[in-house]
Amino acid sequence: MKKITFLLVFISIFGYAQTPITDANIQTAVNDWVSDPSAATTTYGAISTWDVSNVTDMSDLFRDKTDFNDDISNWDVSSITNMFRMFHSASSFNQDIGSWNVSSVTNLSKMFVYASAFNQDIGDWDVSSVNNMYRMFDRASSFNQDIGAWDVSSVTDMSIMFFRAISFNQDLSSWCVTNIDSEPSEFSLNSPLSESNKPVWGTC
């Protein structure tokens, strides 16, 4: 009993027992981190080290967190299925998340809307499970990375995907888009994406 009591006191003093991150508390944890990183570190640890492997939903996680730009490159997002609006209006965020395993994600809609600083290489993402890319890069004004190798064969909605993405002009002509017969509404309206770089709709 004395050993257990000592261990609990030791953990309390030195901060080694941190609150696990779950679906139930991850939004609170992010909010706490943004408002007071020092206090959040005491509770959850540094955000770069969070174990998010049990989280399945990151929708709206950094939405409107306009000053957030911390390293989350090592997050294990392999269990995530929903990244809806994850970085919506996170206008300062521009960290390397290219090594994320997003193979379980089905919803990337609005993920980078108004994420005006983001321009990282995410070309190796496995998006083969994704069915929704609606407005994914809408007004992501800096983004211009090669995503031409993405497997988008499961996607059924690409409407407004690159609307006013004023820097984007990468080759998407090899995308497998058999689920989308014709160019979606406002797919790349007011962006520099050339006709030759667009997917060949209805083909694979």
PLM features: residue spans?
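Negatively charged
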Residues: 4, 15-204
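Regulatory input/activation interfaces that engage signals or partners
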Residues: 12
